Amino acid sequence: LFQLELKNIPKSFTRLAQRFGPVFTLYVGSRRVVVVHGIKAVKEVLPGPQGRVLGQRRHPAFHAHRDRGIIFNNGPTWKDIRRFSLTTLRNYGMGKQGNESRIQREAHFLLEALRKTQGQPFDPTFLIGCAPCNVIADILFRKRFDYNDEKFLRLMYLFNENFQGLSCPWLQLYNNFPSLLHYLPGSHRKVMKNVAEIKEYVSERVKEHHQSLDPNCPRDLTDCLLVEMEKEKHSAERLYTMDGITVTVADLFFAGTETTSTTLRYGLLILMKYPEIEEKLHEEIDRVIGPSRIPAIKDRQEMPYMHAVVHEIQRFITLVPSNLPHEATRDTIFRGYIIPKGTVIVPTLDSVLYHNQEFPDPEKFKPEHLVDESGKFKYSDYFKPFSAGKRVCAGEGLARMELFLLLSAILQHFNLKPLVDPKDIDISPVNIGFGCIPPRFKLCVIPRS
């Protein structure tokens, strides 16, 4: 434990990997942790044969979600519920035209809200977050919130506070010593309180859906899960329960809001730091889309620079640098090492996204990392911000689409204006734990003529 820098655990893992190699064991208290570092080892352990014996490590702060849902579920229901949720998400437009139109509709409301700032400084944390939150709310609840709705803003505040809380040093300690620290004051108490409040809100929505459910005409993903529950209500072994559905929907609501929101916000800060990159994006948008047509996914083919910038933002910030910690569900052997059941396994994504041969000067923000010599977008097999294998992010397709369409729409209509000289903008994260937390900032958005 004392070899870890709690404010930047991924940095500690990198330092230890340089000393001990790509696979090493450390003990946090009595807990055995195996860190897997570097592209070769990570690709072996996630999509490879070992991926089949990896479960999700239970997170003490999310004890209320224990063995339910799809994020921190390590129980027997996880595989089937995840598979059904993914299929239903695809049916509701995941990566297809259905979600494209959802995002385009929401982009209209986001642009209107940005215009109302009238060029004055504002904190983008919740305003920018409204768009991805409404997109996932429509998929889950067939509901759209007004940007000034108090409950809407409260939910986004809880999502944001939990993402930051999970990344603070105290939570890193609590995750490894929950029995010792549970009764002490600390940020773990706030996270658990927030989890309970989010779950209560989602539970109310699920109950409302159940009361008005038409099994022949499901309105959204929540209805689809409830239909499955009704199908097996006479079964001895039930996969779907009201509480399980609530946790699954809450997982998707949190993940579908906060990750995309934080990435967009961090992206705006980076673009203000590098106005020459923003200018190149304006030129590409003007040439391909023009001033009035709403951006579409088909534009990606003609906008390699925007496509590269969106990917480079994700690579550079490495939103979840140490991945979601996994756990060996049975004894296994990896690279000749015996890994006992219950061992925590950490496949580090930052070691892949910051690979210095694939991405020269990886600590620098360079869209050229993903552009080839002819100026076309260059896909990299090292681009793994959504993880890999059976636990890959369920919303990867939706997130990719949101980032491209929303960022394109913002830059189509606005110039970003920082409150300080670009060279004085600090784009270093304020905390790196579960997630990579960007600094708070204000900006102005100036309508383009």
Curated annotation (Swiss-Prot):
One of its GO terms (molecular function) is Hsp90 protein binding. GO terms for cellular component: endoplasmic reticulum membrane; mitochondrial inner membrane. The omega-1 hydroxylase activity is stimulated by cytochrome b5. It holds the Pfam family p450. Its EC number is 1.14.14.1, 1.14.13.n7. InterPro entries: Cyt_P450, Cyt_P450_CS, Cyt_P450_E_grp-I, Cyt_P450_E_grp-I_CYP2E-like, Cyt_P450_sf, Cytochrome_P450_fam2. It is found in: Endoplasmic reticulum membrane; Microsome membrane; Mitochondrion inner membrane. It is a peripheral membrane protein. Its main location: endoplasmic reticulum. Pathway: Lipid metabolism; fatty acid metabolism. A cytochrome P450 monooxygenase involved in the metabolism of fatty acids. Mechanistically, uses molecular oxygen inserting one oxygen atom into a substrate, and reducing the second into a water molecule, with two electrons provided by NADPH via cytochrome P450 reductase (NADPH--hemoprotein reductase). Catalyzes the hydroxylation of carbon-hydrogen bonds. Hydroxylates fatty acids specifically at the omega-1 position displaying the highest catalytic activity for saturated fatty acids. May be involved in the oxidative metabolism of xenobiotics. This is Cytochrome P450 2E1.
